[in-house]
Amino acid sequence: MEGNIQLALICVGAALSIGLAGLGAGIGIGSVGQGACMGLARNPEVQPKLMVFMILGMALAESIAIYGLVISLILLYANPLLG
């Protein structure tokens, strides 16, 4: 019985890990996109330079979701807590 509760809590932790990481990444990417659109509307001449920084910012924000996915996969498949 105790193993089932521990496994259920691990699954909840994995779900929270990927869910919250995805939420944070979505907010970050939205913020980067909003800033890029506002900057492009103010000064259209800087579009090539702005695109580079926008893509870099979105990639860094997306890395948060990838870290959450890695943590979830470790919890589900290579869990050191189950022994």
From Swiss-Prot:
The chain crosses the membrane at residues 9-29, 51-71. It is a multi-pass membrane protein. The record marks 62 as: Reversibly protonated during proton transport. SUPFAM superfamilies: F1F0 ATP synthase subunit C (SSF81333). This is ATP synthase subunit c. GO terms for molecular function: lipid binding; proton-transporting ATP synthase activity, rotational mechanism. It is found in: Cell inner membrane. It comes from Desulfotalea psychrophila (strain LSv54 / DSM 12343). NCBIfam families: ATP_synt_c. Belongs to the ATPase C chain family. It comes from the Bacteria. Its main location: membrane. Keywords: ATP synthesis, Cell inner membrane, Cell membrane, CF(0), Hydrogen ion transport, Ion transport, Lipid-binding, Membrane, Transmembrane, Transmembrane helix, Transport. InterPro entries: ATP_synth_csu_bac/chlpt, ATP_synth_F0_csu, ATP_synth_F0_csu_DDCD_BS, ATP_synth_F0_csu_sf, ATPase_proteolipid_c-like_dom, F/V-ATP_Csub_sf. F-type ATPases have 2 components, F(1) - the catalytic core - and F(0) - the membrane proton channel. F(1) has five subunits: alpha(3), beta(3), gamma(1), delta(1), epsilon(1). F(0) has three main subunits: a(1), b(2) and c(10-14). The alpha and beta chains form an alternating ring which encloses part of the gamma chain. F(1) is attached to F(0) by a central stalk formed by the gamma and epsilon chains, while a peripheral stalk is formed by the delta and b chains. F(1)F(0) ATP synthase produces ATP from ADP in the presence of a proton or sodium gradient. F-type ATPases consist of two structural domains, F(1) containing the extramembraneous catalytic core and F(0) containing the membrane proton channel, linked together by a central stalk and a peripheral stalk. During catalysis, ATP synthesis in the catalytic domain of F(1) is coupled via a rotary mechanism of the central stalk subunits to proton translocation. Key component of the F(0) channel; it plays a direct role in translocation across the membrane. A homomeric c-ring of between 10-14 subunits forms the central stalk rotor element with the F(1) delta and epsilon subunits. One of its GO terms (cellular component) is proton-transporting ATP synthase complex.
